[in-house]
């Protein structure tokens, strides 16, 4: 494709964008549907602190398709855009830009100053976002955007929180939660699940000495840094453990029996002492590894605890427990009154309690701790292990699990409501409902919603010195309690507000909400519910539709579900499309640093937004699978789908204008069979599209219309071309024009939601004066039942299957399509052969074969060969496969033909018989010399490849036509221009030209031919003969 084509595509789309804006078409679509049923849509809010990427464009395209379709299908579809403004993504950018990386730096800079800096950068890339949203062809209302940092939005978030609190679903507690040391704040479980990586970590086995020199317990860990906080060991009470003596060291070790070969693979290296049960170990005491917390021994520490979660598939069957740094450890130790110690600060550094490592980052201390244990003869094994480990989704730093005091939403209390809500949601793809999302709901944990950060919605809890709480649910309530006018709810406006009540002073707790809480409250907060627009909000809840990426099953989809189920015992949305992840072409994550992907702007400038949209929509990524992005794939969509469609429109326009066709004059038109077929295919497509869209299955909706473009361009128009060229104003020509006009107009409406630019371009070139101003103001087409002819569609499908089979035979055996052949034999069921007999000439034309023979039996020129399908049959018969192979080789052709008809056969193996189906057999063909054969799902085709002299001469004539018409196109001649030819060629080519002169001249609009004896003009290879032409336009 040349640069001129690319420029024209981009320029045409920009022109359509201008048309939409100048004529305010989006607003007109809303006005057009005012008073119609509302189709409610929630838009997942992006952060404008980063540039949009292909993932955003994909999700935006999916949303746009569904909303455009709903609008064309008779719904009022408001599409408000929203912005996520709070949280770590914004704070982190400000911290980096201002160098506020040290602990306490933000406080020294001033929370007010820091928050105002955050406010300044929130919309850093808003203009770029608007550009890309427009350029991809997505329609949203930027004039009515909602923002999570707006006063009205934040007040509604307070109302949501207060409502949860009033239901007893909010509590303060200490739990082990994912913790980002880079940010100094806890994260939610679903945030921790968003960024796992394969990493190499230490793998150590530690020797814990039992009291009174009773030997050592071996415990394995991948986090040596937690060993300074060890408070207990755990065994499974039902597992069997062993005591052995290491012959080299003389030390006695206790470990799980199943893990023994893992750590002592050499049986001769140890002496067996005996077995003991896990239950017998429970309660025994051991010596602390480090002296830092040995005083806790008096408080039930350093004992062996029972734990039924222990498995022997890895490790030693004995687990080291640091209750401040592991969720299972925390609960087990809490149950047995083991004290909690947490000598790690919010930056991940050891506190003064660990005096030998104070101030050192815990991950950096792993080697030093292992070295010390080795020096003290407490290290049994040291190595590395490769495993998946969670990283902070924003800073890309490793997370830890840490016991912190936090405020929680009691999600586990409403788990049954969430599961019930999920049952009523329609998921696309469907497996996510009970799979990824359903399983996540089943394992849902209480949600840590408090963050000790700055730029966010403050948690509206005021606490007195004696622990009494005031939970505020509105600005009016805060103003009444404080006596102050509230103009902003951010921390630096309300942190100093003190409430005095009943002789007590209340101050706000120093936390803001997890920004996912803002997102989950979006259905209500976007409308300032319940303070404003209550009726509108309730009427649009749950949303009819949402869409985001697969990662949001543990993000936005989840938080929406938590809050909606808790407050209203309903889902937040009825239908959801989940897309997969777009990767770079090499399979890696797209990375600016690696520069491993083309920019979206470059792709749209080169190939157009429609090509990008269709490439994404017609890929596995809309089925929640990963897509390796390829610019060649986008180019292929343009060249193989969109340009042929544009060419079909250009073909119609050229000849309709040439012959003055008026689409309003449809009287006395009798359609040809091929007209009826394309119209039937069109309205069948309308039905399929409607059905797929009702199921929110975009991939199923797109596939058929891509195939229809092939039907239209490569079959209907190509097969009907001569009808359009008819110089006389015949009824047949009018039928062809009328049919093609109807197809193009209706099809422009079918594709409008998916590829809106080319749809608009087609419609604008076809619409009449009284038609709606834009294709997007039209109704989506309805099925016209009387035009759907299933038998005709099946017959045409059979014809095309046969033609495709014949062409594949030609390609396989290097037989040019332009070389005529004498015979083709089509083998199929008697009924289908009888139905196809009347279209033999059509098949002959397509395959360039003189005689088409329809047979219910394979002709004598071909022998059918069958053998076992080893892949399927091997599973059924096992070692009897060779016997079956020999039996099949002995079968006569009559039995094989019977099998080909019935699809089943019985093979005798001695006294035993085995039934075989088509899937058990592979079929091939042995042909007599001069014949070739091949089969499809329904037919066998046998081509007679023998070339006679007349066939050879006609083949030369057809090649001449092809090359002359190629020169016409290259020479930019108009389709109606007449030409004169000067020809230099060998005698055989001259004879072929003379023999088929009338045909050649008619096909190329040639009026005269001169044979010259010298080379002139462009040279071509015509079936092995060198030929040169000169073409000259002839004035009429």
Swiss-Prot record:
Residue window of motif 'HIGH' region: 46-56
Reactions the enzyme catalyzes: tRNA(Ile) + L-isoleucine + ATP = L-isoleucyl-tRNA(Ile) + AMP + diphosphate
An example molecular function term from Gene Ontology annotations: ATP binding
Cross-referenced CDD domains: Anticodon_Ia_Ile_ABEc, IleRS_core
Chain location of the short sequence motif 'KMSKS' region per the record: 589-593
Any single GO BP term: isoleucyl-tRNA aminoacylation
Class of this enzyme: ligase
Superkingdom assignment: Bacteria
Cofactor: Zn(2+)
GO cellular component assignments: cytoplasm
Main location: cytoplasm
Family annotation (Pfam families): Anticodon_1, DUF5915, tRNA-synt_1
Record localization: Cytoplasm
E.C. designation(s): 6.1.1.5
Quaternary data: Monomer.
Role of this protein: Catalyzes the attachment of isoleucine to tRNA(Ile). As IleRS can inadvertently accommodate and process structurally similar amino acids such as valine, to avoid such errors it has two additional distinct tRNA(Ile)-dependent editing activities. One activity is designated as 'pretransfer' editing and involves the hydrolysis of activated Val-AMP. The other activity is designated 'posttransfer' editing and involves deacylation of mischarged Val-tRNA(Ile).
Record note on domains: IleRS has two distinct active sites: one for aminoacylation and one for editing. The misactivated valine is translocated from the active site to the editing site, which sterically excludes the correctly activated isoleucine. The single editing site contains two valyl binding pockets, one specific for each substrate (Val-AMP or Val-tRNA(Ile)).
Entry protein name: Isoleucine--tRNA ligase
Source lineage: Bacteria, Pseudomonadati, Chlamydiota, Chlamydiia, Chlamydiales
Encoding gene per record: ileS
